[in-house]
Amino acid sequence: ACLARGETCKDDCECCDCDNQCYCPFDWFGGKWHPVGCSCAYTNKYVCDHKKEKCKKA
């Protein structure tokens, strides 16, 4: 089972397809940057290749 675009994730490898990465936008809050949560988002071929390496099943 993998996560579709827009679903909440913790890691790139959880997101379906190679052009789907776990993206964490940041919000300004009280003078500090903090993550507002990560979700699977469309990405480019560079990340695609990186993800293939990183996410190979052991």
Swiss-Prot record:
Disulfide links within the chain: 2-16, 9-22, 15-40, 24-38, 48-55
Described purpose of this protein according to its UniProt entry: Non-toxic to mice.
Keyword Disulfide bond (UniProt): yes
Subcellular location as annotated: Secreted
CC terms in the record's Gene Ontology section: extracellular region
Keywords from the named record: Disulfide bond, Knottin, Secreted
Organism: Phoneutria nigriventer (Brazilian armed spider)
Keyword Disulfide bond: yes
Domain notes: The presence of a 'disulfide through disulfide knot' structurally defines this protein as a knottin.
Tissues expressing the protein: Expressed by the venom gland.
Name this polypeptide is given: U11-ctenitoxin-Pn1b
Family assignment from sequence similarity: Belongs to the neurotoxin 09 (Tx3-6) family.
